Regions:
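Short beta-strand/loop segments at the ligand-binding rim of alpha/beta enzyme cores
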Residues: 84-89
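Nucleotide-sugar donor-binding catalytic core of glycosyltransferases
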Residues: 2-56, 63-77, 90, 95-101, ...
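Short, conserved SAM-binding segment of the class I
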Residues: 80
Length: 203
């Protein structure tokens, strides 16, 4: 394959106005920072024909493409992934959902490497049913955008907001932790009501 690989990045890149800069930055970083040839393939539930796919050395499945749902990966697309003979790498997030099903999909597609957001010891427990030859790695959910690195921040004493927090209501099947994530904001406001804090809480 030589020292420079030809890599196809299978993703669902949002448009710039969809307020998903973290996802966009992560997708764009492959092409921006890799020494290899990166082709960004942003088409939900669609990969190139097998003969085109065969021209690549590596297939990366980005976390914006979920193996859990057919609207992202149909059976036909999964078969293309399975039949791809190069290196297959999966980045996965939201790992609290249908883990056993995800393991089944990963095993079936013969994925070679999985990047999890969990510490490696936890990831090994979560994905215990993966084939033994699959390599597990740990990665971060996101990174600081380059665009804000040079922004000058006010000293803490000059900031108008003491505490900021954002969360959303999660569906019930995400369990206690999903509820607690949302309730933290409400409880914080209740417990600090007499502390004269300037808070910006949305949950």
């Amino acid at each position: 394959m030589g020292s420079k690989f030809k890599i196809i990045l299978f993703c669902d890149r949002p448009s710039e106005n969809q307020s998903a800069s973290t996802i966009i930055d992560h997708i764009d970083s492959f092409k921006k920072y890799s020494k290899h040839e990166i082709v960004v393939w942003s088409k939900r539930n669609a990969l190139p024909d097998n003969d085109v796919l065969a021209s690549f050395d590596c297939l990366i499945i980005h976390y914006s493409i979920s193996l859990l749902y057919e609207r992202y990966v149909s059976r036909e697309t999964l078969e293309k992934i399975k039949s791809f003979e190069g290196l297959k790498v999966l980045f996965i997030q939201d790992e609290y959902r249908r883990v056993d099903f995800a393991c089944g999909q990963i095993n079936y597609a013969n994925i070679d490497m999985v990047y999890s957001c969990a510490p490696i010891e936890v990831a090994r427990k979560m994905y215990a049913s993966l084939n033994e030859n699959i390599i597990l790695k740990t990665t971060l959910t996101g990174y600081v955008p380059e665009g804000i690195c040079d922004i000058l921040l006010n000293p803490t004493s000059q900031r108008t907001i003491d505490v900021g927090y954002r969360a959303r209501k999660c569906p019930f099947f995400l369990g206690k932790k999903g509820i607690e994530k949302y309730l933290i904001g409400k409880y914080f406001l209740d417990y600090t009501n007499d502390l004269n804090l300037s808070s910006n809480i949305s949950s």
